[in-house]
Amino acid sequence: MADQTHVLFVEDDDVIREATQLALERDGFAVTAMPDGLSGLESFRADRPDIALLDVMLPGLDGVSLCRRIRDESTVPVIMLSARADSIDVVLGLEAGADDYVTKPFDGAVLVARIRAVLRRFGHAGGGDRTEGAGAAETGGVLTFGDLEVDTDGMEVRRAGRPVGLTPTEMRLLLEFSSAPGTVLSRDKLLERVWDYGWGGDTRVVDVHVQRLRTKIGQDRIETVRGFGYKLKA
């Protein structure tokens, strides 16, 4: 298992859980599959997987709450699985700290592609609790925007001299904005550059992550340009 990417898959439907586990294992992943949120949390704490796939509707501890508990302890990437793309549960999952979501029923190849895309963003095919990413800002050094400091070498952020804890996805998003302060970046462009989507994606993923980033670096630091996208105030 040490040489494989370890996936924690939490799904209460026996058929989906077993079929998906087999499909992922055929693609070379090591999979721990659990049937409910509480056992999923125990497995996460014991095994420290490289990525977690969480169904939204879970018995005992629902997927959104499980995501929140995981995010309190780790920056490991999380993908939520939802039966409805328009469900408020998708937004709640993203707000709880999920990095992406996949709508059920899903094609196995699509799920594998999404997992690999998330892992590429995190800069590893394995490994757990670190905050890192292949940055959009190629130049090293510290970028300063008012009381906000972005260290593109150390992948660290400070606000008014105090460390700001960001997930790898939030860090990549901030690096993208920092590489072009004052430039409007469309949601589609951010999906392409930050989420590594080679196809159309749900722009709500961008919106929720921008809001999460704002709560950490300042609500007025990232400006919404209606009809176009977002920009970092220079």
UniProtKB/Swiss-Prot annotation:
Entry's Gene Ontology molecular function annotations: phosphorelay response regulator activity; transcription cis-regulatory region binding
Source species of the chain: Streptomyces coelicolor (strain ATCC BAA-471 / A3(2) / M145)
Name of encoding gene: cseB
Disulfide pattern: none
The UniProt record lists the keyword Phosphoprotein: yes
Localization per record: Cytoplasm
A GO cellular component entry from the record: cytosol
Protein name as it appears in the record: Transcriptional regulatory protein CseB
UniProt domain Response regulatory: residue ranges: 6-119
SMART domains: REC (SM00448), Trans_reg_C (SM00862)
Residues with 4-aspartylphosphate modification: D55
Keyword terms: Cytoplasm, DNA-binding, Phosphoprotein, Transcription, Transcription regulation, Two-component regulatory system
Source superkingdom: Bacteria
